[in-house]
């Protein structure tokens, strides 16, 4: 990781590099995933089994777990872990329940009735990685808002461990979050099974949750067959800091995201050159104590940078251009600047609100737009799991008042059958 001075060029060269990373695709992976999807579409459970044997070496003896069996895993985990999951679930629930919307209806004096009906999706599938990349927090972040939205059935798919059993921590989180069924299957074949349905695995309306490049590609290819949350790219953190920030905190926060993936980006924008140098020294000191230091170092080498800016306005302008997944404002008066942030997945205010707080515990969702898509996408929310229908009721008298306007608009567009639909009612 190097230190550079913002000059209107160097920072935007970095932006171009990150945009190029976001657009990279591997045709071989796309081809392989397409084959898997078509295989599952045609072959159902047997195809899922064949792909599981091919990629994982074997098929677990028990594949399906109902609600009672899921809840049994609460007795298999560390009580302290269980307690932490329950507390996190409560925080996530408290935040997301404020997002819930109600159906509404309005009746005018004329007798016209209009409104919007809001209800949860029928069935949602959650993909949760297993093995070394097992994330119980992902279960909570995906299942809790779905539950609040009124989703009728929440299905979770997760690959088994090497022993053929599910990860107990993931299953315990599923119990706390209210997951209805779990199927021990992973990879692109699991995503395809959720999208099309098999003899055993039911078809869902939406697929959410993180996964490797094969899972992400499958979700992207199946969008339209089912809805998806988003196509997630590598993790990102951008920190804007002034001279009041703590270099040891900044170094730790940058590394907390860089450890996710060699393609993760970790960028610090600061108005203090001395803070930039101290942060670099802190990285060198702290990285030696971390398990994933090789991943962190590769991420820093390829997609990490410390940029010294003239002022916070310049830093925030660049932040809005980058539209990062995670944005930390480690400045003296962070609330003063929140109104200047237009594009960010989640914003962490001050020196005592580090990004991992949002990943696990605070309440806001950690499923966030990446690769600059925070310009137009939003975090996963209760709204992600509902559908809305509008309804209209007109009386004969009110339609008669509007008929000439409607017919004129339809005829102007050349849609005479539309106009006729109104006309015949008054002949």
What residues fall within each predicted segment?
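N-terminal Rossmann-like NAD(P)+-binding subdomain of aldehyde/semialdehyde dehydrogenases
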Residues: 1-122
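Short acidic-hydrophobic, aromatic-tinged amphipathic segments that line or gate anion-handling sites
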Residues: 2-8, 181-186, 306-311
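Conserved small-residue-rich beta-alpha loop and adjacent elements
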Residues: 106-172
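Alpha-helix C-terminal capping segments
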Residues: 141-152, 175-177, 195-201, 219-221, ...
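Conserved NAD(P)+-binding/catalytic subdomain of aldehyde/semialdehyde dehydrogenases
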Residues: 178-248, 253-256, 260-265
